C-alpha cells in the first residue's frame, strides 16, 4: 500500500546507518549518522516530513542552528525535522541528495551530513477491502464491510516521464481462486475526458496516458471494478481519488497593467495611496500561488528614490517619505513586481505592472496681484458694465479650488456699487458696476481689493502678508433723462369736469445740474384723449369731459403718461404717469334689466323680477323707485309693479287673462342721488300660453307675430334686390334676341342705303304697326296676301270687316336683297291703303333737305285727288266717323 500527503513511507525504519569510528571517546558534537538514506516517492508534496536527523550538541544549548543546503526545496526545524519546502519531483532535480549543516553561533563550528533519496521500484498496491461474516443466533447471515480508508493517488501535473506512467496496482485477494478482470470507470476513464487513465484488466495496473493540468482539472474520481470471466461482480467497486499535484507553471497576472492613484501633495509618511492586486492560477494554498510584491523602480527619483513603499503581501502602496510637492514633481511612476513562491527570486515566477501616482494640488500657494494699481472708467447710470480686469498669479493647479481666486473689496465702496466676480477661465477679477453711479454725486472711486482662494491655505503654510491692489475708477458724465417727481402722481377729481379745466402741474427736473438744459413736455399715452399738457410748464388741462363710467377707467383710476425731454446732445427723455382718481356724480339714469321677459297668459304660474341698473355708485344709485305710467290706462289696469328691495321689483299680471303676444311696457325708475335722475325704460314682454309647469308652449307663434321693424325692412330690401335682378335679366335677354335678329339681315354692300335713312317723328300708329318679321324683308317673294297681317292682330279703332275693294297686290322686289326697293313699294302701298292711320289727319313733315332718296311720303295732299276716290264706305264705320262720312261721302247738300 502506498501512503501519500505528509505521511512517511514505512520504509524509513530500514534506513542504513554506517557508524564510523570505534572506542570510547570524549563527547564529540556532531550528527549521529554520517549519511541518511531515505526511500520516498518521486513526488514530494509541500510540508511532507522526510526524516529527523539527530545531533549531539554536548551541551552547547541554544547557540546551535540547522541550515538546509537547498532552502528552496527543503527546510529543517530546530529539532532536526526535515520536510519539503515545496512540491517537487525528485527526478527533475539535479541531484538525489541533500546537505544539512549544523552551525554553532558562538564558536562558529560547522558540521555537515548528507541525505540520499531513493525511490521504490514497485508501484503501490491497492487491495479491495475484505469482508467478515457475522452469524446471528437465528441462523441469519449479515455481511459487514470493514472500515478501510483508501489513500488518494498523487500525480504531479506536467510530468515529463514516459507515458503511459504506472500509478498504482489494483488487486483482489480472490484472484488466487478465480480468474478476475479489472476495470475503472468515471471522468478520465470512460467519461470525458476519456482515455486519460487506463487499467490492465489482468494485472490491474492503473496508468496515466498523458500529462495532467491541475488548473484544468484538479482531481479525478474513478471507481475500480473486479469481475470474473463470466462478468460476475466479485468485489464491490472501490473509489480511487487521483489528486493532481500543483507545479509552479503559471506566472502572476496583474488585474490591470497600469494602475492610477492619487495622493495630496505634502502628505505625511504613511499616507495610503492605492492597492495593486494580481492573481496566480496555481494552488493558492501552496507556495506556487503565494505572491509577494515589491517596487522595482521610481521615476523621478526626487526628492528621494524611495518616496513610496508597498506591503509585500497585500499590495498596498503608502508614502514613506516627506517632501511631495506638486509644483516640482506632479506625478510619479512606479514599476511593481509580483513574484510567486513567496517571493523567492530563484524559483519564483514574476510579472510587473506600472503604478502612476498623481499628486493632488493643495492650497499651498496664495494668489498674488500682477500690479499694485488698476485703472478703469464707467459712464454714469450704467449697470452690469465691466470697468477693468484684475489679474493674479497662482502656482497651484489651474481649475482647482486652490487656484480659483476670490476677490473682495475691503474699502472705497461703502454703498456696494461694485462687485468683482471671477472669470472661471482666466481667473481674472471682473470689476463690475452693480448699482448706477452718479457723476453729480461721485466723479471717481478708489477701491482696495484683496484676493484669496476658494479654499484656505493648507495647514502649515504661512504667508507674510495678504496680496492687495488699488482700483481707480473714473465716472464719465452723460446726458441723463429728466425725472418726474413724484412718479406716478395721483390727483382726485369729480367726473364731469368741463372742457379746458386746469387739473394740475406735472413737472420733471434734470439731473444734469451742470448742463443748464431746457425741458419740454408732451403727451405720450392718453387712451380717452381727455388731457393736454403745456409743453413749456407742464400744466395739464382737460380737452374733454371726464367720465368715470368710461371703459378706459379701471377702479375709478384713469392713467395717462407724459414725456419730458431735454435739449441735450443726444436728447434724453423720461416718462411720468398721472393717475386721476375720479369721484362719482349722479350723471347716469337707471334702466331696467332684463330688457326682455316672458310671462304666462294667466297670472298664477309666474311673475317677472326686474332689476334697476345704474352706472353710478352709491349714494347716486339705489335704492330705486319703480313706477308704471298712468297713460295709457290699460297699463295699470293690466299690470301691477311691486317693489321687492331697493334694487329689485316684481312685475305681474293684474288681470286674470291677457292675450298672447308681445307687449312693450314702459317702466319708470328713479335713483337716490342728490338731484335724482329718472328714466323710462321699455320692457319687452312676451305673453304666451303655458303648460302646467309654467313653461311657454306657443313661443314660435308669438315670435312670428312679433317680427320687428328691422326684420321687415331687411325682408323688403331682399325682395327689391331680387326683382331688380330679374328685370335686368329680362332686359338682357331681350337685347340679346334683338342683336341676334339684326345679324340675320343680309345686305348687299352695293345697295346699302343705310347712310340715307332718316329718322322722322311719327304721330300716331301703334306698336303693332312695327311688329313685322325681318325675315320676310329678305324673302319678299314668299309673301302671301293672307300672311301680310297675322290673324288676331287688329287695331282697336280698325273698321269692321266687310267687303272692300280689291287692290292690286304689290309685286315682289326683283331682288330679295334690294331692301330699298322693297321699302319704296311698301310706302306706295301705304299711301293707297284707306285703313292706314291716321284717317283724317294732315301729316306735316319737317324739311330735311334735298337729295333724299326716300321721296315724299303720302299725305292728304297726295297726287290722288279726292274726286278719284269713293268714300261711301265711311258710312259703314259707325258714329265715330259720321262727321268724316258727311264731309266726303255725303251728297251735295
Curated annotation (Swiss-Prot):
Major location category of this protein: membrane
Alphabetical GO biological process terms: adherens junction organization; auditory receptor cell stereocilium organization; axial mesoderm structural organization; axon guidance; axonal fasciculation; brain development; calcium-dependent cell-cell adhesion via plasma membrane cell adhesion molecules; cardioblast differentiation
Impact after mutating residue 160 to E: Does not display significant adhesive activity alone but mediates cell adhesion with pcdh19
One Gene Ontology CC term in the entry: neuron projection
Annotated binding of Ca(2+) 1, by residue: 157, 213, 215, 249
Annotated region described as Disordered, given as residue ranges: 777-815, 851-872
Tissue specificity note: Expression in the embryo is initially found in all deep cells but later becomes restricted to various epithelial and neuronal tissues. Found in discrete areas of cell-cell adhesion when epiboly is nearly completed. Expressed in adult brain, eyes and trunk.
Signal peptide: 1-24
One Pfam family linked to the record: Cadherin
Oligomer and partners: Homodimer (via extracellular region). Can also form heterodimers with other cadherins (via extracellular region). Dimerization occurs in trans, i.e. with a cadherin chain from another cell. Interacts with protocadherin pcdh19; the interaction confers robust cell adhesion activity on pcdh19. Interacts with ctnna1, ctnnb1 and jupa.
Name assigned to this protein: Cadherin-2
Organism lineage: Eukaryota, Metazoa, Chordata, Craniata, Vertebrata
Amino acid at each position: 500500500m502506498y501512503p501519500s500527503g505528509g505521511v512517511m513511507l514505512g520504509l524509513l525504519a530500514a534506513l542504513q546507518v554506517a557508524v564510523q569510528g570505534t572506542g570510547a571517546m570524549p563527547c564529540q558534537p556532531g550528527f549521529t549518522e554520517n549519511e541518511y538514506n531515505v526511500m520516498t516517492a518521486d513526488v514530494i508534496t509541500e510540508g511532507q516530513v522526510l526524516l529527523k536527523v539527530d545531533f549531539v550538541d554536548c551541551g552547547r544549548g541554544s547557540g546551535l542552528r540547522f541550515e538546509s543546503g537547498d532552502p528552496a526545496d527543503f527546510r529543517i526545524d530546530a529539532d532536526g525535522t526535515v520536510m519539503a519546502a515545496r512540491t517537487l519531483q525528485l527526478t527533475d532535480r539535479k541531484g538525489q541528495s541533500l546537505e544539512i549543516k549544523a552551525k554553532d553561533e558562538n564558536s562558529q563550528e560547522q558540521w555537515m551530513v548528507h541525505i540520499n533519496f531513493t525511490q521504490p521500484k514497485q508501484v503501490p498496491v491497492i487491495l479491495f477491502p475484505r469482508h467478515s461474516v457475522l452469524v446471528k443466533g437465528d441462523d441469519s447471515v449479515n455481511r459487514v464491510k470493514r472500515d478501510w480508508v483508501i489513500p488518494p493517488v498523487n500525480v504531479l501535473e506536467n510530468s515529463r516521464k514516459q507515458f503511459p506512467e504506472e500509478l498504482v496496482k489494483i488487486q483482489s485477494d480472490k484472484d488466487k481462486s478465480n480468474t478476475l478482470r479489472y476495470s475503472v470507470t468515471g471522468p478520465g476513464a470512460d467519461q470525458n475526458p476519456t482515455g486519460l487513465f487506463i487499467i490492465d484488466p489482468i494485472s490491474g495496473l492503473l496508468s496515466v496516458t498523458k500529462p495532467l493540468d491541475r488548473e484544468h482539472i484538479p482531481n479525478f474520481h474513478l471507481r475500480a471494478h473486479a469481475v470474473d470471466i463470466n462478468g460476475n461482480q466479485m468485489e464491490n467497486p472501490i473509489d480511487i481519488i487521483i489528486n493532481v499535484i500543483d507545479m509552479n507553471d503559471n506566472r502572476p497576472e496583474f488585474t490591470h497593467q497600469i494602475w492610477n492613484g492619487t495622493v495630496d501633495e505634502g502628505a505625511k509618511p504613511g499616507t495610503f495611496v492605492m492597492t495593486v492586486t494580481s492573481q496566480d492560477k496555481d494552488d493558492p494554498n501552496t507556495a506556487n500561488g503565494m505572491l509577494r510584491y515589491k517596487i522595482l523602480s521610481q521615476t523621478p527619483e526626487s526628492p528621494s528614490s524611495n518616496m513610496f513603499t508597498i506591503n509585500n503581501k497585500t499590495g498596498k502602496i503608502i508614502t514613506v517619505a516627506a517632501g511631495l510637492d506638486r509644483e516640482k514633481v506632479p506625478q510619479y511612476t512606479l514599476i511593481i513586481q509580483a513574484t510567486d513562491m513567496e517571493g523567492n527570486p530563484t524559483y519564483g515566477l514574476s510579472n510587473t505592472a506600472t503604478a502612476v501616482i498623481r499628486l493632488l494640488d493643495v492650497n499651498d500657494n496664495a494668489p498674488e496681484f500682477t500690479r499694485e494699481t488698476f485703472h478703469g472708467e464707467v459712464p454714469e447710470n450704467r449697470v452690469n458694465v465691466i470697468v477693468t480686469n484684475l489679474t493674479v498669479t497662482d502656482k497651484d493647479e489651474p481649475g482647482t479650488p486652490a487656484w480659483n481666486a476670490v476677490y473682495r473689496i475691503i474699502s472705497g465702496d461703502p454703498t456696494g456699487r461694485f462687485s468683482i466676480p471671477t472669470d472661471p477661465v482666466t481667473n481674472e477679477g471682473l470689476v463690475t458696476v452693480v448699482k448706477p453711479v452718479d457723476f453729480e454725486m461721485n466723479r471717481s472711486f478708489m477701491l482696495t481689493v484683496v484676493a484669496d482662494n476658494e479654499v484656505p491655505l493648507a495647514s502649515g503654510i504661512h504667508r507674510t502678508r495678504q496680496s492687495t491692489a488699488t482700483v481707480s475708477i473714473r465716472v464719465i458724465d452723460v446726458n441723463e433723462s429728466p425725472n418726474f417727481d413724484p412718479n406716478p402722481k395721483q390727483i382726485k377729481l369729480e367726473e364731469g369736469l368741463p372742457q379746458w379745466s386746469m387739473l394740475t402741474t406735472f413737472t420733471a427736473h434734470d439731473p444734469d445740474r451742470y448742463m443748464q438744459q431746457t425741458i419740454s413736455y408732451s403727451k405720450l399715452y392718453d387712451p380717452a384723449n381727455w388731457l393736454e399738457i403745456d409743453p413749456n410748464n407742464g400744466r395739464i388741462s382737460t380737452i374733454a369731459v371726464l367720465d368715470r363710467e368710461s371703459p378706459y377707467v379701471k377702479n375709478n383710476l384713469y392713467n395717462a403718461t407724459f414725456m419730458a425731454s431735454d435739449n441735450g446732445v443726444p436728447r434724453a427723455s423720461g416718462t411720468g404717469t398721472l393717475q386721476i382718481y375720479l369721484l362719482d356724480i349722479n350723471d347716469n339714469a337707471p334702466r331696467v334689466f332684463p330688457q326682455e321677459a316672458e310671462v304666462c297668459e294667466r297670472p298664477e304660474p309666474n311673475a317677472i323680477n326686474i332689476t334697476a341698473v345704474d352706472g353710478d355708485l352709491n349714494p347716486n344709485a339705489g335704492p330705486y323707485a319703480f313706477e308704471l305710467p298712468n297713460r295709457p290706462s290699460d297699463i295699470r289696469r293690466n299690470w301691477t309693479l311691486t317693489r321687492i328691495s331697493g334694487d329689485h321689483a316684481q312685475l305681474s299680471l293684474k288681470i286674470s287673462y291677457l292675450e298672447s303676444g308681445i307687449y312693450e311696457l314702459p317702466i319708470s325708475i328713479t335713483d337716490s342721488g342728490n338731484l335724482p335722475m329718472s328714466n323710462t325704460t321699455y320692457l319687452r314682454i312676451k305673453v304666451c300660453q303655458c303648460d302646467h309647469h309654467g313653461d311657454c308652449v306657443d313661443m314660435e307663434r308669438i315670435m312670428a307675430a312679433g317680427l320687428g321693424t328691422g326684420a321687415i325692412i331687411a325682408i323688403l330690401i331682399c325682395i327689391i334686390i331680387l326683382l331688380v335682378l330679374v328685370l335686368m335679366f329680362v332686359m338682357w335677354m331681350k337685347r340679346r334676341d334683338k342683336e341676334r335678329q339684326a345679324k340675320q339681315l343680309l345686305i348687299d354692300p352695293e345697295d346699302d342705303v343705310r347712310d340715307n335713312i332718316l329718322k322722322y317723328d311719327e304721330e300716331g300708329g301703334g306698336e303693332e304697326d312695327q311688329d313685322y318679321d325681318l325675315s320676310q324683308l329678305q324673302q319678299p317673294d314668299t309673301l302671301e296676301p293672307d300672311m301680310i297681317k297675322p290673324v288676331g292682330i287688329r287695331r282697336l279703332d280698325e273698321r269692321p270687316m266687310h267687303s272692300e275693294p280689291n287692290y292690286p297686290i304689290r309685286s315682289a322686289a326683283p331682288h330679295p336683297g334690294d331692301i330699298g326697293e322693297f321699302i319704296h313699294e311698301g310706302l306706295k302701298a301705304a299711301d293707297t291703303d284707306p285703313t292706314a292711320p291716321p284717317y283724317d289727319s294732315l301729316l306735316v313733315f319737317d324739311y330735311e333737305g334735298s337729295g333724299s332718296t326716300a321721296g315724299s311720303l303720302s299725305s292728304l295732299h297726295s297726287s290722288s285727288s279726292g274726286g278719284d276716290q269713293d268714300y261711301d264706305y265711311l258710312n259703314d264705320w259707325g258714329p265715330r266717323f259720321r262727321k268724316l262720312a258727311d264731309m266726303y261721302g255725303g251728297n251735295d247738300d
